[in-house]
Amino acid sequence: MIKVAVNGYGTIGKRVADAVAAQPDMEIIGVSKTKPGAEAFVALERGYPLYIADISKKEAFEKAGIPVAGSVEEMIAKADIVVDATPGGVGVSNKELYAKYQKKAIWQGGEDHEVAGFSFNSSCNYAEALGRDTARVV
C-alpha cells in the first residue's frame, strides 16, 4: 500500500483524499488542517486521521471535539508521498519539510512552476512525469 498524506484538507485536499481513498493500492495516512472547522469534522467522519500544522493549537481542536493525531511533520514522516493542497504560496514553504524526510511530493493548487521544476498535465506530458520525485499539477 502506498501511504499518502494530504497536507491541506480544504476545497482541493478533500477531493484528493477521497480519490486516493478509493484506490485499492493507496491509503490515506492523514490529512491536515490549520483550524478546527467543519472540514475537520468531515475528515473525521470519513475516517481520515487529522494532523495539525501548529501543534500549539491542539487544545483548540480537542475543545471543539476534534481529536488530533499529531503534527503535520509527524504525518509527513509516516507517508510515502505527500499531496500538498495548501493555499497558494504556502506549499512552497513546505518543500524543505518534504525534502527533510525525503518524501515525494505533488503540489495541487496555486503554486508556481518553480516549486517542483515540473508542471504536470496528463494530456501533454504524462510520460515525462513518470519517475519524478516532485511535480506540480496544473
How would you label these PLM feature ranges?
Residues 1-138:
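N-terminal Rossmann-like NAD(P) cofactor-binding subdomain of oxidoreductases
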